[in-house]
């Protein structure tokens, strides 16, 4: 844990959100690292009324240099859509009333290495009365409160002392999960010696039905530093005061970032980072959830992962985590297992290399417990959104898809959802025009050419030669298009993170250029999504400079992970 960022989030957010982290379950076996799986996310184009497009992802395969993507409609034979080097593709204008499956074949040279078939997907009309979560503006995710006992909903706020550290835990109640009141102090810093000079982070509150108790778990520290590395546990009968039981190190191990996972059989587990976040350890709780029964396994050793979150989907356990990087956007990864006390897969990449200018956060069902739609709520700390003056959201909502032990997510500016109806529909501002199109750059190394920045793979990159700035990268869309949105995944060095000052320039003839957007005021790390309106065949990213947070000199080499240009054919 670094500098209290989790605690800050907990103070300003209701405990209701953390309650969504406690997932119910449903047994499929995870694939090994030489296999692959494929899944799709259905999405709607901006201002359209049909959810008739699919963003398809598949896992990269060791030794593969080419993939063939196929589609089957209504269980007819698969037909080849495209041969490509990336690991994603969009498929547009699907038919309402039909069902679709996708197949990917991975080749090393002319040899087939492996293949996989996706689940079935059914395009549909856009439902009414969906709520919009805007990933580019201040947004609040509103999901049902799971802490309901009888006819009463409960939620908890945490108020610090004026001198800092934990002050009070305030209970609020509601009969409709809308209007909350009846504020009551249910835990105070005066209630136990361990609370006098303390702070909580990573707070989890669960309802344990067999004992009719709320159970509270949190990362526990003193109010001034991070030297204790303990967990803490408290409990209460709903409506009554909490009893603080103890703070301790589970099995004698450090404990920093934590979460609690509840399985189908009402067993519960503590997932905890230890040894300054270098290890991730899984513990089983006692049947009353008030103590650690035993250590189950060390899932990761020397991997430096933070904020571990587990969800069970279609019988498979998935563990999502963020790279330890302080306040800065970092690399998201996940592992999967067919049994929670069994062997976990290797860490796998997901999304882009900066969690789209955020950190891997809470993964949850939109409809608690019984829902099928899953989202990643990625956290944007201080340097993720660079202050609230630019109005960007403090969280990013990323729809997650799963297939036999593999997980995928991507970025959309807007996500529509309904918890009651278990609906998640991302919105894309135009078709992806740039993937696989001819790309050039001011310079490029022989092993990282310009087309690596628009190949449909977030894990490959274009790299320029030397460190001369400004520097440009350009794509030829093939014909004049109306440009709506440009998304850029920027390279960063862990420990010396920097953001880029840049301009987006457009041309219809590759001779006369227009400055379509000046982003030399950018302060977002790792990822940007820009809205613009410009007819163009050529789109050029003019990188003016990079500003490193810990060095006044820009020693970066110009490079880009991925550039995505969205829009529509100009008529």
Regions found by a protein language model. Give the residues of each.
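Juxtadomain low-complexity/linker regions and immediately adjacent membrane-anchoring helices
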Residues: 2-5, 12-17, 408-410, 414-455, ...
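Beta-rich carbohydrate-recognition and catalytic domains
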Residues: 56-59, 79, 116-202, 206-256, ...
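Extracellular low-complexity, O-glycosylation-prone stalks/linkers
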Residues: 63-80, 506
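Beta-strand-rich modules
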Residues: 91-111
């Amino acid at each position: 844990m670094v500098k209290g960022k989790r605690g800050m989030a907990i103070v300003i957010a209701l405990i209701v959100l953390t309650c969504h982290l406690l997932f119910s379950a449903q047994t499929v076996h995870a694939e090994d690292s030489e296999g692959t799986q494929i899944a799709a996310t259905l999405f709607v184009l901006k201002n359209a009324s049909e959810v008739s497009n699919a963003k398809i992802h598949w896992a990269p395969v060791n030794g593969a240099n080419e993939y063939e993507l196929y589609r089957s409609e209504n269980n007819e034979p698969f037909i080849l859509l495209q041969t490509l080097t990336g690991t994603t593709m969009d498929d547009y204008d699907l038919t309402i009333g039909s069902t679709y499956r996708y197949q990917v074949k991975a080749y090393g040279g002319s040899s087939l290495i492996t293949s996989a078939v996706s689940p079935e997907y059914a395009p549909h009309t856009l439902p009414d009365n969906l709520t919009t979560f805007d990933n580019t503006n201040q947004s609040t995710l509103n999901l049902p409160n799971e802490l309901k006992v009888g006819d009463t909903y409960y939620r908890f706020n945490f108020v610090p002392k004026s001198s800092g550290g934990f002050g009070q835990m305030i209970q609020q109640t509601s009969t409709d999960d809308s209007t909350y009141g009846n504020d009551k102090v249910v835990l105070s810093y005066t209630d136990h010696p361990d609370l006098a000079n303390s702070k909580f982070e990573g707070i989890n509150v669960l309802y344990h039905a067999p004992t009719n108790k709320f159970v509270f778990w949190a990362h526990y520290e003193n109010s001034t530093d991070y030297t204790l590395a303990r967990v803490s546990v408290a409990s209460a009968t709903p409506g009554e005061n909490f009893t603080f039981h103890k703070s301790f190190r589970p099995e004698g191990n450090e404990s920093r970032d934590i979460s609690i996972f509840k399985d189908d059989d009402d067993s519960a587990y503590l997932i905890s980072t230890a040894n300054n976040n270098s290890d991730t350890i899984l513990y089983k709780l006692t049947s009353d959830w008030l103590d650690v029964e035993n250590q189950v396994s060390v899932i990761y050793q020397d991997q430096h992962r933070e904020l571990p979150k587990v969800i069970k989907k279609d019988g498979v356990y998935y563990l999502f985590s963020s790279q330890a990087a302080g306040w800065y956007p970092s690399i998201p990864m996940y592992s999967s297992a067919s049994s929670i006390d069994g062997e976990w897969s290797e860490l796998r990449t997901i999304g882009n290399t900066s969690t789209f200018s955020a950190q891997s956060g809470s993964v949850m069902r939109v409809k608690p417990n019984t829902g099928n739609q899953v989202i990643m709520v990625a956290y944007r700390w201080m340097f993720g959104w660079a202050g609230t003056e630019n109005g960007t959201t403090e969280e990013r909502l990323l729809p997650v898809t799963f297939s036999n032990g593999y997980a995928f997510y991507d970025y959309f500016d807007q996500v529509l959802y309904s918890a009651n109806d278990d609906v998640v529909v991302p919105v894309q501002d135009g078709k992806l025009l740039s993937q696989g199109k001819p790309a050039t750059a001011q310079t490029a190394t022989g092993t990282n050419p310009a087309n690596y920045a628009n190949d449909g793979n977030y894990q490959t990159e274009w790299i320029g030669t030397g460190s001369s700035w400004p520097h440009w990268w350009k794509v030829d869309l093939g014909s004049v298009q109306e440009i709506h949105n440009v998304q850029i995944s920027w390279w960063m060095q862990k420990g010396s993170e920097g953001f880029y000052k840049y301009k987006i320039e457009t041309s219809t003839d590759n001779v006369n250029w227009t400055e379509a957007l000046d982003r030399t005021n950018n302060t977002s790390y790792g990822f940007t999504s820009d809205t613009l309106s410009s007819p163009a065949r050529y789109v050029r990213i003019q990188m003016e400079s990079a500003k490193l947070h810990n060095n006044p000199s820009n020693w970066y080499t110009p490079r880009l992970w991925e550039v995505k240009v969205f829009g529509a054919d100009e008529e």
